[in-house]
């Protein structure tokens, strides 16, 4: 909660670096529905050149924007991140690939609740990354408020056994890049 308060003060002061640091450190854990309007304002009013300086914060913001169904703003941040990766030669190839992979992970949520489609992006992330995600807290919630994992991905009547097999096939790729988040 202290990161939310810090973010509010950084925003009021126009201290974008401080705001982005608070977002990055919190990993979005303290930001919930009551902060949605304010959080979207932080994202939309932060200058793109400041956002581009903190790729980890962009990834956290993208994930929270997805949760808040603010997809156009999420995609705007995705564009800023991808442009920075394309144009900034100060990033080495390893870092560039880790950020690309983490971006694939966050973008996979746009495929929710199709586990196979999500897994395509998780597999891509696995091939790019040599570290675990920094934008997802492995101790954080996993089910988007759903009472069960089966309920999250069960989409077609009569297909639960097939969907369960899909989960067992697909989830190891997700676990690999998120330090086993959700493997409970």
For each feature predicted by the language model, list its residue ranges:
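Extended alpha-helical scaffolding segments used for macromolecular assembly and cargo binding
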Residues: 1-68, 73, 77-80
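Internal alpha-solenoid helical repeat scaffolds
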Residues: 49-184
